[in-house]
């Protein structure tokens, strides 16, 4: 991270690098990793110092792991200590800064609401259909809550286009009535 780089400048640099990224250029990859990790450190500090939210404190207790090969934007691995915030920086870094903050908070809320353990409990056989349905339900629960918060004090974040909400579940499954701001159990 360049000395004195602010979060917006570093985010812009990460996004510019994504557009020209080459897996074959080891020096570029090294610089990109450094910049992305620096950006992530600034995200932690922003969430703590500017927003005094538990999200930043949660991130401080985690290790960042970058996976350039993953198809997933981000996730949290709880089977390691300290827990790992796993991200594909080429995907996560391409979002706007407000969307990136939303995604980080989204992943943390899955842990706060114990969704990983609940998924294992409800789907011990690892059925992929149940896994997908659980993810939809858990995402709707988390995103509705984040959207409700973002109307006020949490306006520093913005839901990415296409994110799952109770409204999108209503449309996807042709439901006549569905309540917002419910737990995953309601949507599952």
Segments from the language model and where they lie:
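Short, functionally important secondary-structure microenvironments
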Residues: 1-102, 108-188
């Amino acid at each position: 991270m360049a000395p004195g780089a602010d979060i917006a400048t570093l985010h812009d640099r990460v996004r510019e690098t994504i557009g020209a990224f080459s897996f074959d250029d080891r020096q570029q990859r090294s610089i990109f990793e450094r910049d992305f990790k620096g950006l992530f450190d600034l995200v932690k500090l922003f969430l703590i110092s500017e927003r005094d939210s538990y999200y930043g404190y949660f991130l401080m207790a985690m290790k960042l792991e970058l996976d350039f090969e993953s198809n997933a934007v981000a996730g949290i691995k709880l089977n390691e200590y300290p827990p790992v915030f796993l991200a594909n920086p080429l995907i996560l870094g391409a979002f706007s800064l407000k969307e990136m903050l939303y995604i980080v908070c989204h992943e943390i809320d899955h842990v706060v609401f114990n969704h990983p353990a609940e998924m294992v409990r409800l789907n011990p056989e690892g059925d992929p259909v149940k896994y997908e349905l659980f993810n939809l339900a858990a995402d709707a629960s988390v995103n509705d809550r984040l959207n409700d918060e973002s109307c006020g004090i949490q306006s520093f974040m913005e839901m990415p286009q296409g994110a799952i909400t109770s409204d999108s579940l209503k449309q996807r499954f042709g439901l006549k009535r569905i309540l917002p701001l419910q737990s995953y159990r309601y949507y599952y």
